[in-house]
């Protein structure tokens, strides 16, 4: 199957314990996905600099045949700037970067904090 547009959308979902990466075509069909846990990183090691660079190297390897990449990020993490910086330093042709943050406007009540 030949991709005519040669553009992909890289969606990055930041969760508290992991970072998920989805590469899709412009119409939404998933090309590949990966995460830090797929690359043999476990527990708190999944959000370190070493695991981020290994995943970005994998993304570079998989997206060689594409002309450009649109990046969409979602979620909260202290490593968001680090991931975007690593992607900018790579040889990928980044066309746009968008960030979707959903702040609650005093919505649902927070969970009760667990006491040990």
Swiss-Prot record:
Pfam families: Ribosomal_S11. It comes from the Eukaryota. Coiled coil: none annotated. The keyword Protein biosynthesis does not apply. Keywords: Mitochondrion, Ribonucleoprotein, Ribosomal protein. GO terms for cellular component: mitochondrion; ribonucleoprotein complex; ribosome. Its main location: mitochondrion. One of its GO terms (biological process) is translation. The keyword NADP does not apply. It is found in: Mitochondrion. GO terms for molecular function: structural constituent of ribosome. PANTHER family: 40S RIBOSOMAL PROTEIN S14/30S RIBOSOMAL PROTEIN S11. Belongs to the universal ribosomal protein uS11 family. This is Small ribosomal subunit protein uS11m. It comes from Chondrus crispus (Carrageen Irish moss). The lineage of its organism: Eukaryota, Rhodophyta, Florideophyceae, Rhodymeniophycidae, Gigartinales.
